[in-house]
C-alpha cells in the first residue's frame, strides 16, 4: 500500500505535562513535503519502521505525541509507536520502551491534511535527555 509519508517530518512534537497542569512542548520539528530521494524506490512505507532519536529540552512524567500529515493527500496508517530512552546511536534501552495509544488503541490513521495527538503516557522523561521514537507503519 503506497503512502506518501510526510516522514517523521510528519511534524512530530513531544509534549510534557507540567506541574501547572498545562501541556508544554519539549521537542518539535517543522513539517515538510516528502523529497523523492528520501523515500524507498517504490514510495511504499508499509511494513517499515522509522526511528528518530531526539533530544528534549524539558522533562516530565506524563507525555503526549503529536503527529501531522498536513502535506499529504493520503491517510497514513500507523501500526504502533513507542518511545524509549536512547543509548548510543539509534540503540534503545528496551526496558524503558512504552507504547503510545490513540483513543485507547495502539493503531491509528492520520487522515490526509490532519494532525493527531496521542493519549497521555506515563514516562520518566528527564531534562535534556535523548529518547528514541519508533513508528511502525
Predicted regions and their residues:
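N-terminal secretory targeting modules
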Residues: 18-137
Amino acid at each position: 500500500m503506497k503512502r506518501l509519508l510526510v516522514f517523521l517530518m510528519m511534524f512530530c512534537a513531544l509534549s510534557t505535562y507540567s506541574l501547572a497542569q498545562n501541556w508544554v512542548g519539549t521537542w518539535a520539528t517543522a513539517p515538510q513535503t516528502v523529497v523523492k530521494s528520501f523515500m524507498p524506490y517504490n514510495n511504499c512505507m508499509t511494513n517499515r519502521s522509522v526511528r528518530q532519536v531526539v533530544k528534549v529540552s524539558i522533562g516530565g512524567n506524563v507525555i503526549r505525541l503529536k503527529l501531522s500529515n498536513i502535506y499529504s493527500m493520503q491517510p497514513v496508517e500507523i501500526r504502533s509507536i513507542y518511545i524509549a530512552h536512547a543509548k548510543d546511536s539509534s540503540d534503545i534501552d528496551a526496558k524503558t520502551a512504552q507504547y503510545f495509544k490513540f483513543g485507547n488503541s495502539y493503531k491509528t490513521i492520520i487522515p490526509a491534511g490532519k494532525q493527531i495527538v496521542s493519549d497521555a503516557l506515563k514516562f520518566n522523561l528527564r531534562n535534556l535527555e535523548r529518547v528514541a521514537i519508533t513508528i511502525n507503519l
